[in-house]
Amino acid sequence: RDTGSEKKRLKTPVALNHENEIVSRTLQYVADHVCDKLSVEIVSREVGVSASHLTALFHRQMNISPGEYIRRVKLEESKRLIREGTMNFSQIAAQLNYSTIHHFSRQFKDKFGMSPSEYAKSIQSE
């Protein structure tokens, strides 16, 4: 016996196109606002869907959560700013809207396996 809740609905091209558009708008919004305070709730509101819907779309299309994507974009931007060499780590943390330099440093080390200062030293020796 087949109930409606057990059926997987097939996505029509129009539905897939709409999903792609939401994900594309999300990627663009995060890129344009990398220095702002960003959260799944803020971004989902900006692209006009619920946080849970955005999370489901992101998992389906990108294989990561929107929160993880935001973290990755901010951390990649922090690497760029470190390479640029015009800001200290406190300024970079503030520029990218981290609550504290400790939070920034911890996330950086978790992602890249080295602290921001270790990264800065590694690129100076290249």
Where are these regions (language model features)?
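An amphipathic alpha-helical interaction segment
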Residues: 1-14, 18, 22-25, 53
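Short, Lys/Arg-enriched anionic-surface-contact patches
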Residues: 14-22, 56, 64-73
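Residue-level marker of regulatory loop/turn positions in helix-turn-helix DNA-binding domains and
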Residues: 15, 19, 32, 47
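Terminal helix-turn-helix DNA-binding modules in bacterial transcription factors
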Residues: 28, 32, 37-41, 49, ...
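Short hydrophobic/aromatic patch on the recognition helix
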Residues: 53-54, 58, 103-104, 108
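Proline-centered helix-kink/hinge sites
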Residues: 66, 115-116
